[in-house]
Amino acid sequence: KSTLASLIPRLYDVTDGSITLDGRDLRSLRQNDLRAQIGVVTQDPHLFHDTVGANLRYARPGATDAQLDDACRSARILDVVRALPDGFDTLVGERGYRMSGGEKQRLAIARLVLKDPAIVILDEATSHLDTENEAAVLDALAFVLSGRTSIVIAHRLSTVIDADEIVVLENGRIVERGRHALLRDAGGLYADLWEGLVRDDARSVDHADLAD
């Protein structure tokens, strides 16, 4: 699945077959032009040892303070940034203020908003987050992904149930594709994964009741 995330921005090209965008083979497009239209959020986004503002402006060097505010508001991270010791001037990264996994993800989403790409790739963007942080990130993504071509690579079904089309891969091959309800009722691999998720959720509720 992550190989696909590398093929779309042409980090390397397919050796057999083709990948098309609006009917055009990606190999016919200039790499710089293609990548300028793509934004990526991975499971562990990188923050440079720099200020929050500088990390955001890597996506748009000329961004104004108001644009930083708007991007962070869209990514549901503005209140967190304002609460930092020096706001947008707070040093983060390797030797700076350590942000939580959910905060880093939402900062990466804010960077995505500033870039304003036509195509968004999310590569396991919520896989390392707890339930509370995942909910905050998904809330941010629901707003940001609206109206864009979005490719979401995920193991967590909660991330993709609202997708226009879900593609199920097994051993590098497509075994199912369709919308959530269709795949859930088809009795295939996706249905098995969904049933497992439902069982896990039921156990969590039972454990919570016992704890109470």
Where are these regions (language model features)?
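Helix-to-loop junction immediately C-terminal to a conserved catalytic motif
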Residues: 9
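ABC ATPase nucleotide-binding domain helical subdomain, centered on the C-loop/LSGGQ "ABC signature"
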Residues: 18-23, 28, 35, 53-94, ...
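C-terminal portion of ABC ATPase nucleotide-binding domains
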Residues: 83, 139, 156, 161-212
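Hydrophobic anchor residue at the start of the ABC signature
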Residues: 109, 153
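A short, proline-enriched helix->beta-strand linker immediately N-terminal to the Walker B motif
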Residues: 114-118, 147
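Catalytic Walker B motif of ABC-type/P-loop ATPase nucleotide-binding domains
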Residues: 120-123
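Conserved catalytic loops of ABC-family nucleotide-binding domains
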Residues: 143-152, 160
